[in-house]
């Protein structure tokens, strides 16, 4: 289905007409049908979103991925909204049925595998008994050849049954537990889906269980020990290493090679030492860090005395502190935008409802810059190249340009940085921290209407305890003393890196006279 719907953009532009296209379970929107060749301005996966009908406005409907993505839409009439609701609901139902069927097949295969494994254990025990019986017959020197033949026949039959059952187990396992079924995300998922990992409630360490299982399955199937680690697992392994390395003065060597494929294949062997699992390999693109203590000071042994607790900032998919600047302090576009997406959930933790307008503006500006980037990824490798390209084309200060979007994006990031700095420096009143950060950054660019919106949002700010609790990975961690240490540790790495990149952008905008005093 396709047609025009009104979409809420921001408090400045309000409701704007957009051309929407529902295809393959994905709802995409464009400025107009004629501009479709430029690529969609945004999309949402129907299988994972909620469809909500507005309680008052009978032409409005909201599409929401909780904590991640929001589409506020209005049709031109009640009948038109009804047609869209039927189409969207049908698309969601079809995708849900498909996922339910896959989950059902997965559960059935799991039960079948458990049954076969029980049979396998029975045949294994029987096989051991018959081997012992054969040894006994051989050692006692029984002359009855008939008894020896019977024992040999039974042993052969049991071996054949054991091998057949083992083969059936492997067939079920290969069908039910492939990496594609376990780790694959739905095709066409919005980029914001990467933020899901920030809401993980399980500890980082148990990842080795799934890695070990995958290695065992692949070794039986291919005859060699192969392990596939998808992007999310690679990030978790990296974060787990960084948790041990960041607080102390240690040397860490991690050799990695960028791979354009979705997965990274590592060949190696699994070794267990002192109850802890470690991954070792010889021909690998991912080398494990080696820890060398460089100091006998209390700081260098802090991990021996305190529990290392991961926080929201240490488990980000991509962090500003992970970004490596390119030549001439070039800020890599893709990594920067991914880091911006990763910090957006902080606004949800402050209040998913009252801070929704702030979040929508921030995400909207990220998407505008990304839209420019995907038009020519080879050329626009850095943010500076995007800005300079628009400066040369004399469109840098045109409304909705990538340069204008980046201007407001960096202002929004300065607000978040200012707020987090206040928290890091010991401010226990979240409302005060937000107000101080807003006064130093965004307030001068806002008119009285937008200032009023922010004032309302500030009044609804959570308590310090609730905000800190929302930054935990495991429920209850915020009550531990080590969590405060972890927050200080992570923010001490995160905020300086963020400040450095924003300073580079400030210099770029000042040199080319792109700063604007316009008030919105």
Swiss-Prot record:
It comes from the Eukaryota. InterPro entries: GLTP_sf, Glycolipid_transfer_prot_dom, PH-like_dom_sf, PH_domain. Residues 311-520 are annotated as: Glycolipid transfer protein homology domain. CDD domains: PH_FAPP1_FAPP2 (cd01247). The modification Phosphothreonine is found at residues 139, 153. GO terms for cellular component: cytosol; membrane; nucleoplasm; trans-Golgi network. Keywords: Cytoplasm, Golgi apparatus, Lipid transport, Lipid-binding, Membrane, Phosphoprotein, Protein transport, Transport. GO terms for biological process: ceramide transport; ER to Golgi ceramide transport; intermembrane lipid transfer; lipid transport; protein transport. GO terms for molecular function: ceramide 1-phosphate binding; ceramide 1-phosphate transfer activity; ceramide binding; glycolipid binding; glycolipid transfer activity; phosphatidylinositol-4-phosphate binding. It is a peripheral membrane protein. It is found in: Cytoplasm; Golgi apparatus, trans-Golgi network membrane; Membrane. Coiled coil: none annotated. Residues 1-93 form the PH domain. Its main location: cytoplasm. Residues 275-285 have a biased composition (Basic and acidic residues). The modification Phosphoserine is found at residue 145. Residues 275-305 are annotated as: Disordered. The PH domain of FAPPS binds the small GTPase ARF1 and phosphatidylinositol-4-phosphate (PtdIns4P) with high selectivity, and is required for recruitment of FAPPs to the trans-Golgi network (TGN). Cargo transport protein that is required for apical transport from the trans-Golgi network (TGN). Transports AQP2 from the trans-Golgi network (TGN) to sites of AQP2 phosphorylation. Mediates the non-vesicular transport of glucosylceramide (GlcCer) from the trans-Golgi network (TGN) to the plasma membrane and plays a pivotal role in the synthesis of complex glycosphingolipids. Binding of both phosphatidylinositol 4-phosphate (PIP) and ARF1 are essential for the GlcCer transfer ability. Homodimer. Interacts with ARF1; the interaction together with phosphatidylinositol 4-phosphate binding is required for FAPP2 GlcCer transfer ability. This is Pleckstrin homology domain-containing family A member 8. It comes from Bos taurus.
């Amino acid at each position: 289905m396709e047609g025009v719907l009104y979409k809420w953009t921001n408090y400045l532009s309000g409701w704007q007409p957009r051309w929407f296209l529902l295809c393959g379970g994905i709802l995409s929107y464009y400025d107009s049908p004629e501009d479709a060749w430029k690529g969609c301005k945004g999309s949402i996966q129907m299988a994972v979103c909620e469809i909500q009908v507005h309680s008052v406005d009978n032409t409005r409907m909201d599409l929401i991925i909780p904590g991640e993505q929001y589409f506020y839409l209005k049709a031109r009439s009640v009948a038109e909204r009804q047609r869209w609701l039927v189409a969207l609901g049908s698309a969601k139902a079809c995708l849900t049925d498909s996922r339910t069927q896959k989950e059902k097949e997965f559960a059935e295969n799991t039960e079948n595998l458990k049954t076969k494994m029980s049979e396998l254990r029975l045949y294994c025990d029987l096989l051991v008994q018959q081997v012992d019986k054969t040894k006994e017959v051989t050692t006692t020197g029984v002359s009855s050849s008939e008894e020896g033949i019977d024992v040999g026949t039974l042993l052969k039959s049991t071996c054949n049954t054991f091998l057949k059952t083992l083969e059936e187990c492997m067939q079920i396992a290969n069908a039910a537990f492939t990496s594609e079924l376990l780790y694959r995300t739905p095709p066409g998922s919005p980029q914001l889906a990467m933020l899901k990992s920030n809401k993980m409630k399980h500890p980082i360490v148990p990842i080795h269980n799934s890695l070990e299982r995958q290695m065992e399955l692949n070794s039986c199937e291919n005859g060699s020990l192969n392990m596939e680690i998808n992007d999310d697992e690679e990030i978790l392994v990296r974060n787990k290493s960084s948790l041990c390395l960041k607080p102390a003065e240690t040397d860490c060597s991690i050799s990695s090679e960028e791979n354009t494929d979705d997965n990274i294949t590592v060949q190696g062997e699994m070794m267990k030492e002192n109850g802890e699992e470690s991954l070792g390999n010889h021909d690998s693109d991912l080398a494990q860090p080696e820890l060398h203590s460089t100091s006998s000071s209390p700081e260098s042994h802090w991990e021996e005395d305190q529990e290392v607790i991961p926080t929201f900032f240490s488990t980000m998919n991509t962090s500003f502190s992970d970004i490596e600047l390119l030549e001439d302090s070039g800020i890599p576009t893709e990594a920067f935008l991914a880091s911006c997406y990763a910090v957006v959930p902080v606004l949800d933790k402050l209040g998913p409802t009252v801070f929704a307008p702030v979040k929508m503006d921030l995400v909207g500006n990220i998407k505008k810059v990304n839209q420019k980037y995907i038009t020519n990824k080879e050329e626009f490798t850095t943010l500076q190249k995007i800005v300079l390209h628009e400066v040369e084309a004399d469109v840098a200060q045109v409304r909705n340009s990538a340069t204008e979007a980046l201007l407001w994006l960096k202002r929004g990031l300065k607000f978040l940085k200012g707020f987090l700095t206040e928290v890091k420096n010991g401010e226990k009143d979240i409302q005060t921290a937000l107000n101080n950060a807003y006064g130093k950054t965004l307030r001068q660019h806002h008119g009285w209407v937008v200032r009023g919106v922010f004032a309302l949002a500030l009044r609804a700010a959570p308590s310090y305890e609730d905000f800190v609790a929302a930054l935990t990975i495991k429920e209850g961690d915020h009550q531990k003393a080590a969590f405060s240490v972890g927050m200080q540790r992570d923010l001490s790495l995160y905020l300086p890196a963020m400040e450095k990149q924003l300073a580079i952008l400030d210099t770029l905008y000042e040199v080319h006279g792109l700063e604007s005093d316009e008030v919105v």
